[in-house]
Amino acid sequence: MTCSGVPPVSAIADVLALWGDDGWLTPPLHPVVGAPVPTIGRALTITITFAPTGPGLEPIFELLSGDLTGRMLVLAGAAAVPGAVWGELLTRAARQRGASGVLVDGWVRDRPEMTAIGFPVYAIGEHVVGPNGQAQLTHIDTTVTVNEVCVAADDVIVVDAGG
């Protein structure tokens, strides 16, 4: 959900740092498709692991068929997967189901298409190939670690064009 009156993420990070806390996820996460105004969502955490066998990412399609209103999807652990775990099709599905945005601790693809959709996507980088069956969704709504920061289910996430 976009919100007027919410300070920029950089200001929130500065206040957290002054308090001796962490909580910001950039870098290495950066906007692939940045939110033009501060956007808030409650974390829906998803753990992705690299493994040649298992259910693959099939469970994410079931997840994306439900109501995601106000949720910020946080995909943790995907950096080990040798390919993109997020792209245009998942972006379209998440937006249609009401999600606020997605943070991928891994690779994404289809930047031009995702930009046209206008859905906030943050990742560590881009990759042209998909996961080729080597990405497994192993947990949903558990505490995850992204860039040494713990993110629990329902934590408040704020993103903007800067991060």
Mark where each language-model region is.
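Buried hydrophobic positions in well-ordered alpha/beta secondary-structure cores of metabolic enzymes
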Residues: 16, 94, 155-157
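General beta-strand structural signal in soluble alpha/beta enzymes
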Residues: 24-27, 48, 74-76, 102-106, ...
